[in-house]
Amino acid sequence: LPGRSFITAVGIAMSVAVLVTSMQWIDAINRMVDVYFLDAQAQDVSIGFGEPRSSEVERDIARLPGVMTTEPMRAVAAKMRAGSREEREAVQGLPANQELYRVYDAQGHELRLPPEGLVISTMLAKLLEVGIGDRITVEVLEGRRPVFEVPVVDTFETYIGSPAYMDIRALDRL
């Protein structure tokens, strides 16, 4: 009987451990949703265009009734290559001091984009086998389809995906 009681106690302890672990996942998912949809995206409305537009369009939107602030964002489909490694990913161009669409790392720290170079997730850095200071060849898959080399200036840990960010002015110049 003592052995049977011990096994029962161990079984109950393991059941509680599984329950606590599963509850932690709910908290983690809630935290991720809060960061991605409440903290990072402070805008009420996003307007997307199929093709890049001039900054004049942003000024026109800013003049509409009820609009308090605007902020440009540009997502460019691209192939990124480093050596023999290649990944298809969007390069997202954001203002250096973004307010409406902010980027956070997995620790909750807000990332500030430097004036030049790419800031990529650690997952993308791992897939391309690159680090800070290495150069990546970026082949844009839209418009004139330019190909350019850009340095990796920072990496960050993220919850989801393998994003790449750049200052929007630097992206527009390329």
Q: Predicted segments — roles?
A:
Residues 1-174:
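Alpha-helical transmembrane segments of bacterial inner-membrane membrane proteins
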